[in-house]
Amino acid sequence: MVLKCLECDKLLSSIEMAEFHSTKTSHDQFEETEEEIKKRSPEELKQAIEALREKAKEKKEKERILALEEKKTNYKILQKSNDETAQAMRKMQDQARLRDLQKIRQQKAEDAEQRKKILAEIERDKKRRAAERENKNSSVKETAAPIKQPKNANSSSTCTRTPPTSGRFSIRHDGQVCNITIAAEETLRQLAQQVAEKMNVSPPTKFTTTFPRASYGTDVFDKPVNQLDLFPSAVLIPQW
């Protein structure tokens, strides 16, 4: 049986060859024919094989060039993506460093302001204490009366200073200032309770002073404040 492709007039020796031809060319119009398939001479077969080889070679070269172009295109896309990613990473890192720098500057400014306030409070305390001493000395001089003693008699006079009956403490926390006065016999634990009530926080478990640097923990919380070296007044920073 010989089949003829009505679309390209090619003669095919079997149904299988027609199916193969249809797969390669998408031709689907065939009919039986009485024409005979002309047998090729050895030279024609050789030329046909050589032509097929050339076509296969050309096809392979085209595929290689297309693959190379595709590879170049993919590389450019990847390189561009990597450059954009690296640029985005650098931008994010720069922004993070800028935020850290701003935080450091803000913290330094807050520390300087806090130190300024503490120094000012210490200076006010010094002036207040000096004024209290001056007032007490003036009162003693005004109320002291001379005592006459007989001749040749031993005489002595003493002047005692009345210790403070209360302590005045300036509490500094989170930008807030709270002044609290408690009796000399009251304890740091009672002071901590007042800090919690007035500043709306939990009772602190430790107090520190900046000038001079000292800390007072729970081991001294039950001692009267007049037995501690922060009495009669101090600037305290609560801690938890």
Curated annotation (Swiss-Prot):
Keyword Zinc applies: yes
Please give the SUPFAM superfamilies that the UniProt record associates with this protein: Ubiquitin-like
Q: Where is the composition biased (Low complexity)?
A: 155-166
Q: Where is the composition biased (Basic and acidic residues)?
A: 120-136
> What GO molecular function terms would the record report?
K48-linked polyubiquitin modification-dependent protein binding; zinc ion binding
Its keywords, alphabetically, are: Metal-binding, Zinc, Zinc-finger
Q: Where are the zinc fingers (C2H2-type)?
A: 3-27
Keyword Acetylation (UniProt): no
Supply one GO BP term: negative regulation of protein K48-linked deubiquitination
A Gene Ontology term for the protein's cellular component? cytosol
Region: Disordered; residue ranges are 21-43, 120-171
Lineage: superkingdom: Eukaryota
Under the heading InterPro entries, the entry gives:
Ubiquitin-like_domsf
Positions of transmembrane segments: none
Q: CDD domains per the record?
A: UBX
Q: What name does UniProt use for this protein? A: Uncharacterized protein C17C9.11c
Task: Give the organism the record lists.
Answer: Schizosaccharomyces pombe (strain 972 / ATCC 24843)
